[in-house]
Curated annotation (Swiss-Prot):
It catalyses: 1,6-anhydro-N-acetyl-beta-muramate + ATP + H2O = N-acetyl-D-muramate 6-phosphate + ADP + H(+). It comes from Proteus mirabilis (strain HI4320). This is Anhydro-N-acetylmuramic acid kinase. Belongs to the anhydro-N-acetylmuramic acid kinase family. SUPFAM superfamilies: Actin-like ATPase domain (SSF53067). GO terms for biological process: 1,6-anhydro-N-acetyl-beta-muramic acid catabolic process; amino sugar metabolic process; peptidoglycan turnover. Catalyzes the specific phosphorylation of 1,6-anhydro-N-acetylmuramic acid (anhMurNAc) with the simultaneous cleavage of the 1,6-anhydro ring, generating MurNAc-6-P. Is required for the utilization of anhMurNAc either imported from the medium or derived from its own cell wall murein, and thus plays a role in cell wall recycling.
Length: 370
């Protein structure tokens, strides 16, 4: 792997904005040096959300979103560089994930689609950009996700300790770092996505701060069991999912079967859905000594409390304790994956994605010679 400074750019299924991180990366070291967050303008967020939920969209609108996101990513990167007092010449490459608008790994012809024009990112920043990370893995029969477990293994793996890394973003996913066993990782189900959507409808705020609203409600057992009966939760790995499946339509389908539930009780039940669907998968894999949590859901005290209660004997802690910011974990991972791509090294783990082989991920968008 070519040592240098890399920038990772991530906008996840929560659709809150763009996380950008600067890291010094070498073979054995990932050292975060700066970070920046640029929120999505509300109108842009709503347009992306409409596409992600399968609402009809014209090619003109899709192309416009692709271009606008590319420009927004470039703006976030330049703001990060200004904060760090660095120039484009100081950066080896950018790893830009893009915004997933559809992910369908189980169809007859599996595909995934991310937007955010990397040509614009490279042109506007003057920095070589690596993007389109997921489709090469899919071309070899994989799910195209999750890709972050390879990074988790590199930076959080332990020779003797059973560890599981849990990322609670819009979707929750786990990386199983078990000594002597090939790494596995997959999406467990909803993370913050349904919680945020339901909270927005009733409180018009982006998220339920620390789970305070959920704490005022009571879990509706009938609704919880109805949702947990969804076949996704019992499906074997490898598996991945997204907003195209676990969305407001999915929630209302289940609410129609259990009517007249108070809004705060729905929120409390969604917290329990997230926590139980995670805990069940931890237990299914034999448990662990440490559950290392990152992502926005790590700030939800209700989720963290329920995880600790559901997993007695497991230390539930934040990845920040190990020097890796939970807010920036995925952006760091794509900076690391960009470094691997630039060095012609594979970035996927077939034991995680189900691909038939390891492969170099992504496409490189070189900048013009200086």
């Amino acid at each position: 792997m070519k040592a240098g400074r890399y920038i990772g750019v991530m906008s996840g299924t929560s659709l809150d904005g763009v996380d950008v991180v600067l890291a010094a990366i070498s073979n054995k070291l990932v050292a975060q040096q700066a970070n920046h967050f640029l929120p999505y303008p509300q109108t842009l967020r709503q347009r992306i959300l409409a596409v992600c939920q399968g609402q009809p969209v014209t090619l003109h609108e899709l192309g416009l979103l692709d271009a606008q996101l590319g420009e927004l990513y470039a703006k976030a990167i330049m703001e990060l560089l200004a904060k760090a007092r660095l120039s484009a010449a100081d950066i080896t490459a950018i790893g830009c994930h893009g915004q997933t608008i559809w992910h369908e790994p189980e169809s007859d012809i599996p595909f995934t689609m991310q937007i955010g024009d990397n040509n614009r990112v490279a042109a506007l920043t003057g920095i070589t950009t690596v993007g389109d990370f997921r489709r090469r893995d899919m071309a070899y029969g994989g799910q195209g996700a999750p890709l972050v477990p390879a990074f988790h293994l590199a930076v959080l793996g332990h020779p003797t300790e059973k560890r599981i890394v849990l990322n609670i973003g819009g979707i929750a996913n786990i990386s199983l770092l078990l000594p002597g066993v090939a790494v596995k990782g997959y999406d467990t189900g909803p993370g913050n996505m349904l919680l945020d959507s339901w909270n927005w409808v009733h409180n018009q705020t982006a998220y339920d701060d620390n789970g305070q609203w959920a704490a005022t409600g009571n879990v509706n057992t009938q609704l919880l069991q109805e949702m947990l009966a969804d076949p996704y939760f019992s499906r074997s790995a490898p598996k991945s999912t997204g907003r195209e499946y676990f969305n407001t339509q999915w929630l209302h389908y289940h609410l129609a079967k259990v009517p007249n539930v108070f809004p705060e009780d729905v929120q409390a039940t969604l917290v329990e859905l997230t926590a139980i669907s995670i805990a069940q998968q931890v237990q299914l894999n034999g448990g662990c000594e440490r559950l290392l949590v990152c992502g926005g859901g790590a700030k939800n005290g209700q989720i963290m409390h329920r995880l600790a209660s559901l997993l007695p004997g497991t230390e539930v802690s934040l990845t920040d304790k190990y020097g890796l910011s939970g807010d920036d974990m995925e952006a760091l991972a794509f900076a690391w994956l960009a470094a691997r791509t630039m060095a012609n090294e594979p970035g996927n783990l077939p034991s995680v994605t189900g691909a038939s082989r390891e492969t170099i991920l992504g496409a490189i968008y070189p900048t013009n010679p200086r």
